[in-house]
């Protein structure tokens, strides 16, 4: 069965055909690093991690780019408001780059624990200012952009294809209460910023032909995707909340600059809800990933996420996560039993299961069906082990399939489940110790015993554990 992908642009499943034979170029929007990752990040990056893994298992060479937004993402997600990283730096009374670097380390620490493989390249917006300026110059030269008072805007009316991804026209966007900023200096209210003149006191700023300023949020992804993957890329992924305005603006500025299709297949993962309600800080149901991983097995969380298709919403509850953890443990129990029991005389042909697994993954990366196949195989293995056992040749074939399916593709099991379980328990024990250390440090600071407070911090740092004081309290992370 050929691989079919649901293309958000055409709104249909399409047979995947790479631009270059045997090679897949993938760009996924990375996090804006102004806070710790949340459960929505986990769903998105685990989903695309499995996409990348399956392409590699299918024999493709994958070039995977995932950016880090460390400047330009304003609080209203468009042209107005304060830079999110600068706002956090102001709240924590520190430098914006320190904020970006700290939360970038925190993000990768969480992703590593969830088994999310690193991208080939993880470019940052601040390291690609020249490329972004060059893209703005091209758009100005071609007549798709205009400069006013040191700000440069993309003229939406100049690009006929604007709205083809989200299905939203300019008027529909405005009527629906879109947060695309409205400034009187724009030719049209829907025009979006490519370059912003820095206000007085704005720390993160660069010299440009138009002003000392900073790039618009949408600009960075186009500039970095095209630098590392070319003017047309195979797959662009991200959360469905980025479809408009972010991805719509990416298409407009990229295709206006090159005259070529920007992305061949758009993939969007759905959102996370909590007990049936959309997750959000304002609703006070925000699930902090780092806190969750301090009490939960990372593999169980990964398994929980993959039980839902990437295009389906994921409803989080403690009960649902408990059930997922129990289901994964049953699967692991079968794998441990299978690996420890000697060969027998009975047969178990894994071929039908392997075929069904491939069919599921080739059907728009249908991980729930793929997991169901593993449970069906688990039942068959237990039945065979209860009877005559499994001959060595069939055992080898089953082991090879499990390595491809459970380990290399889904990332929900390893070849050493005992070590896996031990690592999860170790992190839980470390968290309990850290809570005691943080409480001791908090009490010392409360009594103005700063010498003891600093000594605790320095001792932990020497052990590879970094402490950061935030307005919500102290948080810890493992360095490296």
From Swiss-Prot:
Subcellular location: Cytoplasm
Reaction(s) the record says it catalyses: tRNA(Cys) + L-cysteine + ATP = L-cysteinyl-tRNA(Cys) + AMP + diphosphate
EC number(s) on file: 6.1.1.16
Cofactor descriptive note: Binds 1 zinc ion per subunit.
SUBUNIT field: Monomer.
Family statement: Belongs to the class-I aminoacyl-tRNA synthetase family.
Protein name: Cysteine--tRNA ligase
Source species of the chain: Chlorobium chlorochromatii (strain CaD3)
């Amino acid at each position: 069965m050929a691989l079919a992908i649901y293309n958000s642009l055409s709104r249909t499943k399409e047979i995947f055909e790479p631009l270059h034979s045997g090679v897949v170029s993938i760009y996924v929007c990375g996090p804006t690093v102004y806070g710790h990752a949340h459960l929505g990040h986990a769903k998105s990056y685990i989903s695309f991690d499995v996409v990348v893994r399956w392409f590699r298992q299918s024999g493709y060479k994958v070039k995977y780019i995932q950016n880090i937004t460390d400047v330009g993402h304003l609080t209203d997600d468009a042209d107005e408001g304060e830079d999110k990283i600068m706002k956090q730096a102001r709240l924590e009374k520190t430098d914006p780059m320190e904020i970006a670097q700290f939360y970038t380390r925190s993000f990768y620490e969480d992703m590593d624990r969830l088994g999310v493989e690193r991208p080939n390249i993880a470019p940052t917006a601040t390291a690609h200012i020249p490329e972004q300026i060059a893209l703005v110059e091209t758009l100005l030269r071609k007549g798709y952009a205009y400069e006013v008072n040191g700000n440069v805007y993309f003229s939406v009316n100049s690009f006929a294809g604007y709205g083809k991804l989200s299905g939203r026209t300019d008027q529909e966007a405005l009527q629906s209460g879109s947060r695309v900023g409205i400034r009187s200096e724009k030719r049209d209210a829907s025009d979006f910023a490519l370059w912003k003149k820095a206000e007085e006191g704005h720390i993160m700023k660069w010299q440009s032909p138009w002003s000392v300023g900073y790039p618009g949020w949408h600009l960075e992804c186009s500039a970095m995707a095209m630098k590392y993957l070319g003017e047309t890329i195979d797959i662009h992924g991200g959360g469905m909340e980025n479809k408009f305005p972010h991805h719509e603006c990416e298409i407009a500025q990229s295709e206006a600059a090159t005259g070529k299709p920007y992305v061949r297949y758009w993939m969007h993962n759905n959102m996370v809800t909590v007990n049936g309600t959309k997750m959000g800080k304002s609703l006070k149901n925000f699930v902090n990933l780092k806190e969750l991983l301090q009490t939960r097995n990372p593999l169980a969380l990964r398994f929980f996420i993959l039980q839902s298709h990437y295009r389906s919403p994921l409803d989080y509850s403690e009960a649902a996560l408990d059930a997922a953890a129990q289901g994964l443990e049953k699967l692991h129990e079968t794998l441990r039993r299978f690996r420890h029991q000697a060969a027998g005389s009975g047969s178990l042909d894994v071929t039908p299961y392997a075929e069904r697994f491939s069919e599921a993954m080739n059907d728009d990366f249908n991980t729930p069906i793929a997991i169901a196949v593993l449970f069906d195989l688990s039942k068959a293995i237990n039945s065979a082990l209860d009877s005559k056992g499994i001959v060595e040749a069939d055992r080898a074939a089953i082991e090879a399939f499990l390595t491809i399916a459970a380990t290399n593709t889904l990332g929900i099991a390893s070849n050493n489940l005992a070590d896996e379980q031990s690592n999860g328990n170790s992190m839980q024990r470390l968290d309990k110790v850290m809570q005691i250390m943080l409480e001791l440090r908090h009490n010392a600071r409360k009594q103005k015993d700063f010498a003891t407070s600093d000594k605790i911090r320095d001792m932990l740092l020497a052990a590879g554990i970094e402490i950061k004081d935030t307005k919500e309290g102290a948080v810890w992370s493992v360095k490296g």
